[in-house]
Amino acid sequence: MTEQISLVDVSSSVSLKGEDSSNVALLRDLFINDVAASDPAESSADVHKDEHSSDNSDNDNEAVPKPNDFSQRRRIQNAQFEALLSKRTDADSNEAIDRAPIALSDDELSIAHLVEKQDLGNGMLDPREYQIELFERAKTQNTIAVLDTGSGKTLIAVLLLRHTILNELDNRANGKPHRVSFFLVDSVTLAYQQAAVLRNNIDQNVAHFFGAMGTDLWDKRTWDEHLQRNMVIVCTAEILNQCLLNSYVKMDQINLLIFDEAHHAKKDHPYARIIRDSYFKAQPSQRPRVFGMTASPIDTKGDITEAATRLETLLDSRIATTSKITLLREVVSRPIEKVWAYNRLESPFATELYKLMDTRYGNIKVLEGVYRFAWHASSELGKWCSDRAWWHALADDVLPKLEGNISKLVESNTLNAEHGAVFKDIIRIREASETVKNYSFADPELPGELSPKVQLLRMELSKHFSDTTGTKCIVFTQKRYTAKILNELFTVLNIPHLRPGVLIGVRPGDIGGMNVTFRQQFLALVKFRTGEINCLFATSVAEEGLDIPDCNLVVRFDLYRTLIQYVQSRGRARHCTSTYAIMVEKDNAEHEGRLKEIREAEKIMQRFCETLPEDRILHGNDHDLDSLLQEEEGRRTFTVKSTGAKLTYHSAIAILARYASSLQYEKETVPQVTYVVGHVSNAYVCEVILPEKSPIRGLTGSPAIRKAVAKQSAAFDTCLLLRKHRLLDDYFNSIYHRRLPAMRNAKLAITCKRTNEYDMLLKPSIWAKQRTTPIDKLYGIHISLLPSKPLSRDHRPILLLTREKLPEFPAFSIYLDEDVETKVLSYPLKHGLQISVDELQSLTTFTLRIFRDIFHKVYEHEVQKMPYWLAPAKALDGPGSGTNPRDWTDWDTVSFVHNNDEIPFTRDLNPDSLVNRFIFDNWDGRFRYFTVAVADTLQPSDPPPPSVPRRRHMNNIMNYTLSLSKNSRARFFSGCDWNQPVLQAELVRLRRNLLDKMTTQEKEMQTECFICAEPLRISAIPTSIVSTCLAFPAIISRLDSYLIALEACDELELVIRPDFALEAFTKDSDNTEEHRGQQIHFQRGMGKNYERLEFLGDCFLKMATSIALYTQNPDDDEFDYHVNRMCLICNKNLFNTAIKKQIYRYIRSRGFSRHIWYPDGLTLLHGKDHSKKLLSEGKHALGEKTIADVCEALIGASLLSGGPENRFDMATKAVTALVDSPSHRVSCWKEYITLYTMPKYQTEKPRGSEDDLARHVEEELGYHFTYPRLLASAITHPSLPSTWGYRVPCYQRLEFLGDSLLDMVCVEDLFRRFPDRDPQWLTEHKMAMVSNKFLGALSVKLGFHRRIMAFSNPLQAQITHYVEEIESAQAESRGAVDYWVVAKDPPKCLPDMVEAYLGAIFVDSKFDFQVIEVFFERQIKPFFEDMSIYDTFANKHPTTFLHNKLTNEYGCTNYCLKAGELPTIDGAPAGVLAAVIVHGNVISEARSSSSRYAKVKASEKALAVLDGLLPFEFCQKYHCGCKETQNSSSAVEIGTAI
């Protein structure tokens, strides 16, 4: 159970790609069940065990790994984890039962736990229903939204702007005049902020203007350019007012006026003057739509009802608000209000420093403001704070501004400025600065240094920051000096866990040490959001509109003066456990009166909202739900027969809410269902939008007379749809965590254990077929050797002659002499050789003589049974495709060998004629020699030199040479020539596997010998031919492998290059798929194995099946695509196809065998018989996953082999052959487009906004859309109601397609650039290229974040915050391309849009993959030119880091990470337990709702346990001796990111 469940991951299954997504499997194949231990390989015989064996040359002396206890270790680990899981389950069950509800009705029983836990109620909405209703209202009439701070007014403004822009673009397309939208703000800071928000959420040019930009100097032509270039202008109100008055901008050129903080519209405020002087002066038909936003209709004291009515009249709008405070309370958390009362303050007084400064410099006018603040600060803040004001006012960076101000003051008061007076005051200012610098400031900790008010603030903040609970605080002050001085004070006080910062308004030209820039203000907000600052001392700039992140403590250090100040500052405390503290002076009647007055004003405001006419109150869509529930008669119901569970209109809402919550990622807010109610004819229609991670997006319900009924009906139908897709079980509980992972896990639902034996082809069928073919013509392959450096002897080329023409083989390496790498070059000769009977007899004799003399095998002379012939060849000047075999055959040598069985030894033979000969022992296959020279100083009776290899008979050279038995030796010695020359010779090594370098044992073998020729036989074959033929076993073995691989390709009707075909079928160890694990039973000399091709083929398989499903099923949703694709590409499906087509027969799982390279079918007369070996080696044990991997490798080989028309043709055909499914019946790339029927939305005439979008994207990215609505679909978020998207589907289908296209282009790039990297390295670095983290940054770089069409308040905020962070990271990176690595994870919609865009351009271009490659080269590859900077990207994942730490730092291999599901009682949320086990010790465990997060948590805990542990301490603590047994084969089972 645990091994399968350990791969289940709800969250990543829900995501549109397996996150693949940030979140990726680094060691993906190490989790798939247990790899069984290999059977011990048959021991090789000792090469010297029997000196008289007639065939010792056939004993293979190459080392074989010893068997290991790997399988036993896995079984122990599994048992340990099962025991732990059982123990934890037993411990949990009683607690779970205690928590289970016991008094619930039948139809609620299955949902009770989550309803209670999540407090779902009727299911809160996101976006909220009142926001949707307000947006719909604002589209049709001028509206002022009176909603509490934090209730999402800006979201409504963004939606309204988008709606207005879409209509504007359509109008422009129809030839109407251009109009723009104005977003008016009351401060420069808000102009920056709101413009940034709009740019991040609107795909049009957004400009922001303020007075400091010199707008008052712009003429009409400049404004015309801005109106032409921009769709939205954010500006301070006075700018627009002046433009309207000057007629630079006319009211009929504006389509929407948005008033931010609309309560300012009164008296002579620019808001009021714009409406009064320009808006009302225009004809009603020429007036723009008006939308105002405020938390309160007034910002001063007075009659609220009268003020609200006046605001409505002034803005020509109607207030819309909510009648019930509880409606907003569920959205905007109301803080707990507290009053912090401090003791009475002293009257202001002069401190010592104040007196000193007043005495010396009291008449310097530029310091008047500092004197005033320091005087009042002595009472309000205390002596220390009063004195520190001088430090800030006279700091070095402030002095130049003070000096400049002195000059201005003197010039303004004196007609003829006296330079002497100016100079004198400047000197005095500098002296004052030195005085302050030299002054000894007291310690603020001393009694009397701080006022009672500051002391109380210190005490309370110390309490709130007493631990690291994550307190975030804003302290509001009236004056900027106060904020800055308090910030300095609390920095000095150094309260634990408190990190102070300051946020004050920007005042250009300000002096006195208070000047700040917009950048400083922005950075303060960023630091506060990230937690670098957790206590912000701020002025009113943080009250109104500024994007301040939620905090849980707000302190009004200086008491508010108006209701709007109170409401807005309170609104900053939005956390569910927030505190809003008001500091008041004890016994201060004014303070008490102000508190009472403001609270009374809020009550009046609430009553005003409740007394508004019915049509101006936002009830949400549930306002009449209670009464409607009484009208059940005639409503549909659905009952599950097996359980009796009943679905009703009423229960459907709660069921969907709970279903949505089951899709939650950890540490995320609970996903929620969106209901959009629209008006159609005389009825209401509701669209249900499920969360983005849901495989079912939702539906549009049936029309109903009332809103609530329409909503319930749509929810009811959605529940039925979820039931249909088996996403709700028989109790209407979400079974998402069971359903999706089961399908997602299909790819790994097979075992890699070596449990099955399969037939293996040892010889290509061409040799057997040729034996029955008449011999009238032979075809030749010219084989030559090209060494990397000179060899010790000459190697002449040879011809391999066959009955049938063989394909052209690629060059491959063998290792001759002392591991000199030598290329084997083979060229097929174009023409056949008409052969005579005599020539055939000669060739047969020559070939059989090679087997006898060189390889100690004597075969019967049977011409018809010969599978091939060998002949000496002449050297080729170039490729031999146009040559005739007859012209290139050395017939003289063939005839000489045919006519001479050997060169006889005679006593009168010239000794020099024996040099450079091949001499062999006729009785012992171990002894073959190349003669080097005549040893004139030695006689046959002399003892052999001590350097020669040891043998039994070492008394003299003649005895040493002879290998006969005792009696035969005596007869030979009695008649031999004891005066013959002694020859220096080189003993030929028994090494046959020249496909790999020599082993240490082979290198240590001594080859120099001294021999006599008479006991041996002198071969008639020239030594240059013998040298080449000694390599023939390795050569013919590799050619056989090529032919077997090509035979498999022929069976599958695939045309693949031989080198790629063989690579795809090569498995060179028991655990080839474990890319970095120690290879078990590694087979030497097999060349490249399938792992890189499998990596490439897996990616193409994903892309090909994605395209096929997309083209044939245009109406499927993304969930269907994922499940159907997984069924196609899963290992189980590939394995089943491979079994059906017997692909296992062609897999090469064994290296060179010295037993099976000999020609098959000949009658062996002398030598060791290998027929039994052929039978035993004709089987091999393969894991199911290996067979599936080979299928993927074949696809990769097909891809590299190209195709007749398109380079993807052969790979496409391979996918069809290997998935064997009706869903993919494509024989070439161009057939995909023939399967595709364009959906209606794609071919419809695009709206003006869609044409505009396509034009902008073409300008920026260079691709021209033939069908702009495809692009519109690529930017449409699932949260957007379909009725608002103009029937363009959301991007999920295109994202599904684009995800696979992106994978493919990235993998191909890495595959080409890094030919020697293993698949794990490629996977880890591909992770960086396709990670959500990178794609999110790329999305921002390309501006996609501004184009997204979404309807989600949290999403808008997430995008804005992410854009701020990623742009800040880029700015600080100094040009580094990996700036995105340090940023937080982006909202998922941003990377999704990049992938959807790729899908869109691919479909638009009629499936031209080149458009994907162009995008990759321009936009992606520049980030990844240097891949080394991403070497640690994947390794930062806790699971991978743990693996590397245990393996590399501690050298441990006996560990694992297991995960398994904890059984639960019905209705309780499923849980997963993960544990890290090291040498039988459970060192960490963790629980979570998904396997993914459980593993991450367990890995993090394990890393904490191991932190600081030295290697020797680790070995002692966990009894680890793995380093001492590193040579024993092992593979570690460690977790993946999923």
Swiss-Prot record:
Which parts of the sequence are marked as the site Important for activity? K1388
Region feature Disordered, mapped onto this chain: 39-72
In what residue span(s) does the DRBM domain sit?
A: 1440-1508
Instruction: Tell me the disulfide pairings in this chain.
Output: none
Which enzyme type, at the first EC level?
A: hydrolase
Protein EC: 3.1.26.-, 3.6.4.-
Any one annotated GO CC term: nucleus
Name all Helicase ATP-binding domain ranges.
134-315
* Residues covered by the PAZ domain: 892-1020
**Which stretches make up the Helicase C-terminal domain?**
460-619
Which biological process annotations from GO are given for this protein?
A: defense response to virus; regulation of defense response to virus; siRNA processing
Q: Which residues bind Zn(2+)?
A: C1452, H1479, C1520, C1522
**Domain RNase III: start-end pairs:** 1044-1203, 1254-1406
Cofactor requirements of the protein: Mg(2+); Mn(2+)
Q: Which SUPFAM superfamilies match?
A: P-loop containing nucleoside triphosphate hydrolases, RNase III domain-like
Protein's job? Dicer-like endonuclease involved in cleaving double-stranded RNA in the RNA interference (RNAi) pathway. Produces 21 to 25 bp dsRNAs (siRNAs) which target the selective destruction of homologous RNAs leading to sequence-specific suppression of gene expression, called post-transcriptional gene silencing (PTGS). Part of a broad host defense response against viral infection and transposons.
User: Can you tell me which family this protein belongs to?
Assistant: Belongs to the helicase family. Dicer subfamily.
Q: What is this protein called?
A: Dicer-like protein 1
